[in-house]
């Protein structure tokens, strides 16, 4: 599995999908290899995680190059040392590397992600790149995977390309809320938004709308993102004393309890496929 931050899942939907799908494949006896990036250089990633072999490789710490540089390193490692039965590539933006896999006669399934060219963080050049990468993914993949019907419809209409629609799921979790006290919260006593701090997820809009309201219960905001300092400052500037900015919460049990105990969940995502935070 190539093209994301990998496992353990500590970032977004792709990483959650890899963890959930990868561990199930491993449980069925498949040998699963996940290429991963490490957000904490001082703490090495585990070499084996939930039955999956983890290969930690470096990446250029620049928004426009981080994914591509890591995917390129992953492809080189894969071709030299692994040569798998199949490669599962995440994100159509990684399609420039698909010819190398095809030349090695490795079947490729590409999870196309959402309509990345619509994201405001990319300028005209980035948007053109994403559109071209989508077309390349259609030509060079043995199979295309979409996680939402809208994405499948887009590829059918834009490229006359069939996709395998594999919708995300969400686990049924116990309805415990005992750990909310760690955050000085009570079940039913707060509003919640969980999102990566991207413009299209509209965390700032949610916070702005909340602070303009007469709501008495606090708004708990869970989320962060690399390269999002300016956007984070905007969210912080809109918040008042009723807004609790927790940053990223990677303790899954605690996060599940936050979902369970929320009076209202606010979801502002406007680009992409199915979002795991909404399903939960």
Pin down the residues of each PLM region.
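N-terminal strand-loop element at the rim of the active site
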Residues: 4-10, 24-62, 150-156, 225-227, ...
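Conserved donor-binding/catalytic core segment of Leloir-type glycosyltransferases
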Residues: 181-214, 220
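Nucleotide-activated donor-binding/catalytic signature segment of Leloir-type glycosyltransferases, i.e.
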Residues: 232-253
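An aromatic- and histidine-rich active-site surface loop
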Residues: 68-80, 84-113, 117, 273
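Membrane-proximal helix-turn-helix segments that form the acceptor-binding/catalytic region
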Residues: 126-144, 153
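Acidic donor-binding loop of glycosyltransferase active sites
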Residues: 257-273
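Acidic anion/phosphate-binding donor-loop and adjacent secondary structure
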Residues: 121, 167-187
């Amino acid at each position: 599995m190539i093209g994301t931050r990998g496992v353990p899942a500590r970032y977004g939907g792709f990483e959650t999908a890899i963890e959930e799908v990868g561990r199930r494949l491993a449980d069925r006896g498949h040998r699963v290899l996940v290429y991963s990036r490490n957000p904490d250089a001082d703490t090495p990633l585990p070499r084996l995680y939930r039955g999956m072999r983890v290969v930690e490789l470096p990446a250029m710490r620049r928004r426009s190059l981080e994914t591509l540089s890591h995917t390129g390193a992953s492809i080189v490692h894969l071709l030299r040392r692994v040569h798998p039965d199949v490669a599962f590539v995440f994100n159509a933006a990684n399609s420039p590397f698909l010819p190398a896999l095809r030349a090695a006669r490795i079947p490729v399934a590409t999870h196309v992600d959402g309509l990345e060219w619509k994201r405001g963080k990319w300028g005209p050049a980035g948007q053109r790149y994403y559109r071209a990468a989508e077309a390349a993914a259609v030509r060079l993949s043995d199979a295309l995977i979409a996680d939402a019907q809208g994405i499948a419809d887009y590829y059918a209409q834009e490229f006359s390309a069939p996709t395998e629609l594999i919708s995300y799921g969400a686990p049924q979790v116990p309805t415990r809320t005992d750990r909310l006290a760690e955050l000085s919260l009570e079940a039913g006593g707060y509003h919640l938004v969980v999102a990566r701090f991207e413009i299209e997820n509209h965390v700032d809009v949610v916070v702005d709308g909340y602070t303009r309201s007469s709501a008495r219960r606090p708004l708990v905001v869970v989320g962060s993102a690399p390269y999002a300092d300016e956007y984070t400052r905007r969210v912080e500037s809109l918040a008042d004393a009723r807004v609790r900015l927790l940053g990223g919460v990677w303790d899954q049990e605690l996060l599940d309890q936050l979902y369970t105990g929320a009076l209202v969940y606010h979801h502002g995502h406007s680009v992409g496929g199915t979002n795991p935070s909404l399903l939960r």
